[in-house]
């Protein structure tokens, strides 16, 4: 009887492992539906948004923040698979509450660059994206962080994989990108770092994943302007992150950045 129970337990563990792998990289089920948020930063939104029209198996809608923030509420997960956020916008407490409830329900979230500055005054946001820009020395969970310092906007940043087995980083070549370099921000200790840098003027954790309720979260520090956006490696990472956040297979046969 004991041997039988042990065998059943082993089978259950094996099945759970298979289920986890399938959930990690599920086969395609139609196009990935993406909602892209922009606004508040002053960059050329059309250049950034145009990238999504060139990505295979993806359809996107662009909305302006904070004007259309009320769209981010429970029920949106039935219309979209992933939200890609590139805005820097302050939203109301009511809108933040609805947005938090949506994320808890489960929708993929890809947060890029200055989006960590969004939702000013909503402390929960740092728990969602796993990081925070500290305008001044800030105490978080008993430790002091900041102030965040900018070294430049077109600094050569060398990026390497921190976890070569993660779907977003697997088979991704090292690359260098000219981008905004900043450091001394807050990064939560429990995020899973996917990409890193040893560029001393830059935050070492370049990109990482987290979980917020049922929401898969990916945040990347890169992407200040067109010079970064036009780097093939940036497009590759963004494409992989969207697929991962949607629970889809990450096609590693697609562009591998030089």
PLM segments and residue spans:
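Positively charged n-region of N-terminal signal peptides that target proteins for export
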Residues: 1-4
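Bacterial N-terminal signal peptides
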Residues: 6-17
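Sec/Tat signal peptide C-region and signal peptidase I cleavage site
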Residues: 18-22
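Extracellular ligand-binding/catalytic regions of CAZymes and related secreted enzymes
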Residues: 24-31, 64, 201-204, 211-258
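Helical hinge/lid and interdomain linker segments adjacent to catalytic or ligand-binding clefts
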Residues: 27, 31-37, 43-119
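Short, solvent-exposed loop/turn segments at secondary-structure junctions
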Residues: 41-42, 90, 116-117, 199-201, ...
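Catalytic beta-strand/loop cores that center a nucleophilic Ser/Cys/Thr
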Residues: 50, 57-59, 146-216
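A glycine-rich, often tryptophan-bearing local segment used as a flexible ligand/cofactor-contacting loop or short
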Residues: 89-167
